């Protein structure tokens, strides 16, 4: 069935998904914070700031008015950076239709509270609306989806009916959506993989090889799984699209912003220099801090995350961090 969908956030991923949904025949309004971006997308059918070179579907509408975006919608897709979710969705509450399903595609952990995105929603939404929350995540570079390259992701919701409805709304012949009931696991996979991707980028920037990257991906997956289990997630989720799938993509793909940040750090640039030149958000930078503090709070051993925190926030050298990881006390593999 055709949905009336409000897409909140016009970065590369929000714009791509809005375009996909419009092409599928849904009635879609894309909300952007920047009035000038709304005007450009209306006039030129292109988001030159975040998704240059992609012609947007003629059915797609644009606004920077939250009330207009939400009017009469049956589904909401929120794709703002994770550190902005609380503010944007709190501002949205007066306009949010009570019957609308909410789909979260933000990947991160709130720095100030250590809350996952679904925990933020749980705090601000009425209980009945939180019951129809879903998380959409998986290995999906926006540009590849915009170019209709085959992609598979996961929609997680505690309600099977909600997961099915999201699955049906988003699935096309090039974008396949699988269902899952493990919202916590799907969210954590999407958040923690960004930190490991920065680590993989640092390894590449230092000139290390495929062995090193494979070790980081594998042990990063173990850390992600440990944290997830401590928070009530299912271990099997991390072997799926939202865990291993997204981790491999983000640690190896040339379109990965987080890996790019890491490569530049490995080559000797400072984090402040790198972030000062970026238009788009590299979620892994903030998530490094929140994941480090969350692991300490829960008593979960996450040595890669710990070394990443010391590199990004305490000026530890990358080579020193690598040496510490390689000379830790010897252990059985396991998780």
Curated annotation (Swiss-Prot):
It is found in: Cytoplasm. The keyword Nucleus does not apply. GO terms for molecular function: glycerol-3-phosphate dehydrogenase [NAD(P)+] activity; NAD binding. One of its GO terms (cellular component) is cytosol. It comes from the Bacteria. Sn-glycerol 3-phosphate binds at residues 107, 138, 140, 193, 246, 256-258. Its EC number is 1.1.1.94. It holds the Pfam family NAD_Gly3P_dh_N. The keyword Ribosomal protein does not apply. Belongs to the NAD-dependent glycerol-3-phosphate dehydrogenase family. Catalyzes the reduction of the glycolytic intermediate dihydroxyacetone phosphate (DHAP) to sn-glycerol 3-phosphate (G3P), the key precursor for phospholipid synthesis. This is Glycerol-3-phosphate dehydrogenase [NAD(P)+]. It comes from Citrifermentans bemidjiense (strain ATCC BAA-1014 / DSM 16622 / JCM 12645 / Bem). The gene is gpsA.
